[in-house]
């Protein structure tokens, strides 16, 4: 089984969010299961310098982008048993930032065609091309409309498209069809690519892929509804026979408190008390009162409305009347950043607002915190709650998407469950469930058992990789 995993980012080379984690961890797990899996991403300027210097040039060729004929270099590097390819073009990818440029349509039109040209240039034919999010959305379109019709090399390659966040669809002016792809407007007028008055990369992928996946069971159901479907819900209902939800996992090699070299004191489920040394160290480092008995409630997140920040802003002053400490790590919308900076200023030794993304600090926060907040408005899967479980920080989540699938509400009478949850997007419900969690926290026997439940939760990639592998096999036999 040969699989080409195509993404716009991949850890440890470069990442901006959960997609990068998936593209770094899932292929590694598939390789362990005997799959010949290779990953391809753009060669951005910001790729980790230490790794960038190890990339080996393979070959170059030209790629047609409408009337343009652009240079494409292919570099490669083997990491953790997986071959990574890097598509090189200085004009498109040697810039500040991966996304948000005026010509993103052209940049990823080039990338998508370069990927299809690359596999023939390298004479490596995958059974499956697994595409991820809108940046790779035109690959299934190009494959079906052009490459399979013109060249027998491509005729039996199947495509999978994974939706990591349906809110980002890649919609551009219809002029890109002739300008970037050399197509007429038929695909626009027949609505296969038409989204409002534009061309949608994601819509094209949904229409032309052989299978569609998303990152949790609940999110697969949610995006078929008007509330969550971002106006593609009707199409996903139509395609529901080929839509599957497969839960993300986390990389147990990277996120393991037993041997994590970014935290102060290693620990596991058999010596949970060592977690308190991490807590005291973090309190000291962040200027909080050093007291292991005060619960630390943490968020490591993008500071956006999707993450439920409106709810936390609403209750923050009431919440801080409790004997707690609040730690925030992340960047995002300025009004949220300013609010948490103000709380930090006002409450000093009770609040630490770290308005930056700092991976080292994030690991320390997971290891030191007692509770981890994710009151998201919507959450396709969520990785934060999975990492928190691994480190024995108890998730407090809203029941949506992957949060609903991975967090089982604690039952104080049976001792079952691995976190706390609430249903309605309501600030008072959030405050109520946090205060309930605080009540359980002060019952040390119950809390200790809850932490063990959390740390014993299995959220590795192994089970999910089996589901992907079964899907690949099913597709390749069609």
UniProtKB/Swiss-Prot annotation:
The gene is glgA. InterPro entries: Glyco_trans_1, GS/SS, Starch_synth_cat_dom. HAMAP family: Glycogen_synth (MF_00484). Synthesizes alpha-1,4-glucan chains using ADP-glucose. Its EC number is 2.4.1.21. It holds the Pfam family Glycos_transf_1. ADP-alpha-D-glucose binds at residue 15. GO terms for biological process: glycogen biosynthetic process. This is Glycogen synthase. Keywords: Glycogen biosynthesis, Glycosyltransferase, Transferase. Pathway: Glycan biosynthesis; glycogen biosynthesis.
